[in-house]
């Protein structure tokens, strides 16, 4: 009897172990670990399969509601088609306890992109500034704040954030400083504040002599104040320093030379441009027109 009971106990134990093994095996097949699923979602994102990635990420958060990074990526994917939903998801993550500094940065970064997507630049700016309270030298945040300031045409802020960015990177770009002075000058020009605009354009030139836009718009100021000689001088400098964009003042230069009785200098101007950039199509065409007006062969271009 005792032997029968013992045998029965052994059989029951083996059966229980078998059932447990089957259950665990079945569960592992039917419910893959969330880290594996998350990797699958990332792979789907890389392939551009957003629908599959969303489906997998929803499966991840259903299995593990504490998988913050899965929620984060889910919101990032939804941003393009359902930005409000993305914002709700990302905002809900800000109150999660025990978040690492890295995770907090990623959440605020996601929200900054969300708000920028819907044109809420004030909130986007606040989120980027939140990142700087966590990481004072965060390059992404500083670049983002520069971009936001430029989009809002807030040139003082753009210049300020640019200087902070340059301090962090250790790379000073005088063209950036000059660019914002030019933008300030353009604001003055729009408001007919010619003297203020002139000072800012001159400041831009002094800051970065090789940055062409300062010369272009300083020429425009002189044009409005009827100082055609100085206007011409600055336009020509701009055209030679910005070979790609200089064509925009070619017409002004031709008109100024004509009004000054110096139209014969047009040919030399375009030849100078072609010495600097032999493939400048606009200069080639205009020089051909000048030669044609003079009755000279286009072969004289050579």
Show the residue positions of the predicted features.
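Register position in tetratricopeptide repeats
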Residues: 46, 80, 117, 151, ...
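Conserved structural position within tetratricopeptide repeats
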Residues: 61-62, 95, 129-133, 167, ...
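TPR alpha-solenoid repeat register
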Residues: 70, 103, 107, 141, ...
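Short coil turns that delineate tetratricopeptide repeat
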Residues: 65, 98, 102, 136, ...
């Amino acid at each position: 009897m005792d032997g029968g009971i013992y045998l029965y106990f052994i059989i029951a134990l083996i059966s229980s172990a078998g059932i447990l093994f089957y259950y665990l095996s079945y569960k592992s097949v039917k419910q893959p670990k969330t880290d594996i699923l998350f990797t699958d979602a990332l792979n789907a994102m890389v392939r551009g399969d957003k629908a599959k990635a969303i489906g997998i990420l929803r499966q991840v958060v259903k299995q593990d509601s504490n998988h913050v990074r899965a929620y984060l990526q889910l919101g990032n994917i939804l941003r393009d088609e359902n930005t409000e939903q993305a914002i709700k998801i990302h905002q809900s993550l800000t109150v999660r306890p025990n978040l690492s500094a890295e995770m907090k940065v990623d959440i605020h970064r996601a929200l900054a992109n969300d708000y920028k997507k819907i044109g809420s630049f004030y909130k986007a700016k606040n989120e980027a500034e939140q990142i700087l309270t966590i990481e004072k030298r965060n390059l992404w945040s500083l670049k983002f704040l520069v971009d936001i300031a430029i989009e809002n045409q807030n040139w003082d802020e753009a210049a300020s954030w640019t200087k902070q960015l340059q301090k962090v990177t250790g790379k000073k770009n005088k063209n950036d400083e000059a660019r914002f002075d030019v933008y300030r000058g353009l604001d003055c020009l729009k408001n007919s504040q010619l003297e203020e605009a002139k000072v800012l354009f001159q400041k831009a030139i002094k800051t970065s002599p090789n940055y062409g836009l300062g010369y272009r718009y300083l020429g425009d100021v002189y044009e409005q104040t009827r100082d055609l000689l100085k206007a011409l001088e600055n336009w020509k400098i701009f055209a030679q320093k910005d070979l790609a964009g200089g064509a925009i003042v070619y017409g002004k230069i031709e008109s100024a030379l004509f009004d000054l009785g110096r139209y014969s200098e047009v040919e030399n101007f375009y030849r100078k441009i072609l010495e600097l950039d032999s493939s400048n199509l606009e200069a080639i065409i205009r020089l051909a027109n000048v030669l044609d007006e003079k009755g000279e062969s286009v072969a004289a271009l050579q």
